[in-house]
């Protein structure tokens, strides 16, 4: 259960005191004294709280109060007792007749504390700052100092290890993302690579695409096989053959027996055939006989031609 309020706060006046209110309070206390602060506001004709009347009388209206600046003797007393009592302002003010605890506290915080700091004195311990630093260095013996240094170094190492570990993790994540691209980009990457390969083939002067020039002739039939025009009248190779030779072509070799049989058969038919071995780079017996046929009008899909679905191994068999 709390204390009963000293007054009705609805009709209480707040704020700065006026000179008329000070006169009413001072005259009433001079006649009746300070017996009951709850009844003084009502009996003195003041719309003030009892606590407000008490503080006003104690801090401002008492006849024994001193007003004005503090003297040097008063300052010396405040500093002396503050070094012993600390911030116990009421006890310090009791050593200064006519000064209130509120006046002493305000004067210390606004004046004396700054004055002592400017003189190189700690306002809390009332000792010179240089003396405090000497005490700190002498109080901590060398083992304690080294222990503190080791602790600080350990904290620094832990922090650096954390930063390095974090950076390594970030780099691993970047590398992982580079080696594992988004699956949605696989088709785009494949298309780009295919485009590069295609453009590289087209950029060459004697590109592989020239092999399929139907004007030079490429036919494979039941009776004859021709691959463009291997040699021209001036003895130079045709563009198709040059392209195959320039790009390495198909590594071929013609068995001598098969060539002899083919030549003998064509001679019987009255055809003149010139045999030439094309692309003699090393291989393991895989090859194809490339013959020159002077019929430039023949193409892949002649009406006399027959198309076969040949296996990969059939290309190395002898042609008869």
Swiss-Prot record:
Cellular localisation: Nucleus
Q: In which tissues is it expressed?
A: Expressed in the tapetum and middle layer of developing anthers. Expressed in trichomes.
Disordered: annotated segments = 257-283
Q: Which UniProt keywords apply?
A: Developmental protein, DNA-binding, Nucleus, Repeat, Transcription, Transcription regulation
**Organism whose genome encodes this protein:** Arabidopsis thaliana (Mouse-ear cress)
What protein is this chain from?
Transcription factor MYB80
DNA-binding region residues: the ranges are 37-61, 89-112
Q: Which PROSITE patterns match?
A: HTH_MYB
């Amino acid at each position: 259960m709390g204390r009963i309020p000293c007054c009705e706060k609805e009709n209480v006046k707040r704020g700065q005191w006026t000179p008329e209110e000070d006169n009413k309070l001072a005259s009433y206390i001079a006649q009746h004294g300070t017996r009951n602060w709850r009844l003084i506001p009502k009996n003195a004709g003041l719309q003030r709280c009892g606590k407000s009347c008490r503080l006003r009388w104690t801090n401002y209206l008492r006849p024994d109060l001193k007003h004005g600046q503090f003297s040097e003797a008063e300052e010396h007393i405040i500093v002396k007792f503050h070094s012993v009592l600390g911030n116990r302002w009421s006890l310090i003010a009791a050593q200064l007749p006519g000064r209130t605890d509120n006046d002493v506290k305000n004067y210390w915080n606004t004046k004396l504390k700054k004055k002592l700091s400017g003189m190189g004195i700690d306002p809390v311990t009332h000792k010179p700052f240089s003396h405090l630093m000497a005490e700190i260095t002498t109080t901590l013996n060398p083992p304690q100092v080294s222990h503190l240094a080791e602790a600080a170094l350990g904290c620094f190492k832990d922090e650096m290890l954390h930063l390095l570990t974090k950076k390594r993790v970030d780099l691993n994540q970047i590398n992982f993302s580079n080696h594992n691209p988004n699956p949605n980009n696989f088709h785009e990457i494949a298309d780009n690579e295919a485009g590069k390969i295609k453009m590289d083939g087209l950029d060459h002067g004697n590109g592989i695409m020239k092999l399929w020039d139907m004007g030079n002739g490429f036919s494979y039939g039941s009776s004859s096989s021709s691959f463009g025009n291997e040699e021209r009248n001036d003895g130079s190779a045709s563009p198709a053959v040059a392209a195959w030779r320039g790009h390495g072509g198909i590594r071929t070799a013609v068995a001598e027996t098969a060539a002899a049989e083919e030549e003998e058969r064509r001679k019987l038919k009255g055809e003149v055939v010139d045999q030439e071995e094309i692309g003699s780079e090393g291989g393991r017996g895989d090859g194809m006989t490339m013959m020159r046929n002077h019929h430039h009008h023949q193409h892949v899909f002649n009406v006399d031609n027959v198309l076969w679905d040949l296996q990969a191994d059939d290309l190395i068999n002898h042609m008869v």
